Amino acid sequence: MSFHLDYLLALPGVRVETCTQVEEKIFLGLSILSKGIVCHHCKNPTGKLHQARPILVRDLSVFGRPVYLKIPRRQFYCPTCQRYPTERIDFLDVKRRHTQRYEQNIYERVKQSNMEQIVREEGLNYDKIKGIFEQVKKNRIGNGLNEFVSMR
């Protein structure tokens, strides 16, 4: 697509291939720049793509419009250990459907106001907002403990 969209999106390791608007929502089709991964199981590199299924991930809004990223979820075959590791994406936590920066934004906004207001603003249900808030809070506590241990 355009260097400008890649620059504005500012997510590592991806390129914007398509940009479409449906009603009030913006959809960005992304491609991943890396050709392979390091297997999570045996730590050997592999570039043998087994399958790629797209997932839809919510990102920060732009100009008051919600943004969704269509990301290929790639699974590779590792000939060394004969397993099928799924590629990890830097800006997306495992089994999450929102970018880390979107979840961080929700967390900060809930701290400043309340969940009901964020539910109205984002168009998500209460349980989803609460789940995002609790997940970010849990990650922060875990990171805080790790920092504390490393200081000792």
Where are these regions (language model features)?
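Short, positively charged, Gly/Tyr-enriched micro-motifs
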Residues: 43, 58-152
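Short, conserved DNA-binding cores of transcription-related domains
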Residues: 1-83, 89
